[in-house]
Design a protein with these regions (language model features):
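Conserved ABC ATPase "signature" region
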Residues: 127-144
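Hydrophobic anchor residue at the start of the ABC signature
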Residues: 161-162
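Conserved ABC ATPase signature
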Residues: 148-156
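Conserved ABC transporter NBD signature motif
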Residues: 71-80
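ABC ATPase NBD coupling module
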Residues: 80-97
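Helix-to-loop junction immediately C-terminal to a conserved catalytic motif
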Residues: 63
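Q-loop/switch helix immediately C-terminal to the Walker
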Residues: 102, 109-121
């Protein structure tokens, strides 16, 4: 009698032997050297970084913005490197929700319109409008739909940013929080919202941060330092 072998889960992001160089007129700076990474499709994963250029390069590679490197990148089994620019943009816009410490809005538009116009290629306008209202309700800010961004508090704006990321029902959330003008309260609230989304919606989270004041529990911590990855925290 044969045993049942569980199929290997497709990784959320899978990077293999990534070599990335930043070329300028004077020299070629090594950003990544043989970088290999698998991000679990169910986990809340934290990547701690030190260098902004490494963080930016990593986000651009896993989201398909940058394919100027050697190696292989997969997103949910999709081989990013063979897709053209339009295909990569479509994959990114439909399947990844982005949330950052600094989130930009159209100040002349209300909350509803800021979210509405952020969704590309929406064919069913009625369905989209219902999705926006339901998403605002899930974040507890449905009464703010007609408010302009400049009239909202920092916490309320962050909830709007999360609503904008979630309204398209993404396969994952990529979040970035840097320690410029760091506020522990703001960071803790940012983490609280991420944890809530991960728990309530079962959406995998990838948080990339250079903050050291971490009052949180995640499934995996990875350190990005000098173009290499290490399991756990590394000083």
């Amino acid at each position: 009698m044969y045993g049942i072998t569980k199929a290997r889960q497709i990784a959320l992001f899978s990077l293999t032997n990534i070599n990335k160089f930043n070329h300028d007129k004077s020299n070629a700076e090594i950003i990544f050297k043989n970088l290999t990474l698998d991000i679990n499709n169910e986990h809340f994963t934290l990547i701690k970084y030190q260098q902004e250029n490494e963080k930016n390069a990593l986000i651009d590679i896993i989201s398909g913005v940058d394919i100027q490197y050697t190696g292989y990148t997969y997103f949910l089994g999709n081989y990013i490197n063979i897709l053209d620019e339009k295909q990569r943009a479509l994959l990114r816009n439909r399947m990844i929700g982005f949330v950052f410490k600094e989130n930009y809005f159209f100040n002349h538009c209300n909350v509803f319109d800021n979210i509405y116009y952020s969704v590309v290629n929406h064919k069913d306008k009625k369905k989209l409008k219902n999705n926006i209202i339901n998403t605002l309700k899930s974040m507890g800010i449905e009464k703010l739909y007609n408010k302009t961004p400049k009239s909202l508090s920092t916490d309320q704006l962050l909830k709007v940013a999360f609503s904008r990321a979630l309204v398209k029902k993404p396969k994952c959330i990529i979040a970035n929080y840097n320690n410029d003008c760091f506020s522990q309260n703001n960071f803790d609230y940012f983490i609280q919202l991420l944890s809530q989304v991960h728990k309530d919606l079962s959406i995998p989270i990838l948080l990339i941060t250079n903050c050291n004041h971490l009052n949180m529990t995640v499934d995996k911590i990875i350190t990005l330092k000098h173009g290499e990855l290490y399991d756990g925290e590394k000083t």
